[in-house]
Amino acid sequence: NNKDLECKCLIEPLSVKRIFRLQDYFENHSLPRIRIFNEAELIARRILQNYPPDLPVALSDEASVHLVLVGLGSVGQSILLQLARLGHYRSGKKPKVTIIDRNVKQQWREMVEAYPPLMTLVQVETQELRIEEVSESDVDRWLFDEKPVTMAYVCTKDEIANLRFARLLVNRIQARDSD
């Protein structure tokens, strides 16, 4: 009866959504009514909307965006993809992303295979580390890079480790400010 009815369909995990093909499950005339989504993608959109990566440098014609992204699971990957989609900032420079994860090199290769344009849309530096292995000197190197960090997103599934990393980050910023 309802000719305008649409169906939104959750497909998890993100790796399955990437390869999912609606046409394998529905007739062609039904395809316009079906939309698939993923929870990690919704979270990433909301995070970047509420906590824009360029907030500290939004009015600058020179400064560029530099994110620290801890965790390249579904949410981390979705943040990176959303950043690539939106990453056109006032300075005209492509955003730099320092990605920290224990298996980041393989995960990054898989992302680039799935989304080849990523290489041209973001500048990525990978750090093959578990979140618990990150040291003060690592944080200092990222914070005080030639492109200073503008935002950090900590996205591992271990909330205690996430909070410890956040505390380390804040402590290093405060230590530098007091020098």
What role is predicted for each listed range?
Residues 1-179:
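Cytosolic regulatory regions of ion transport systems
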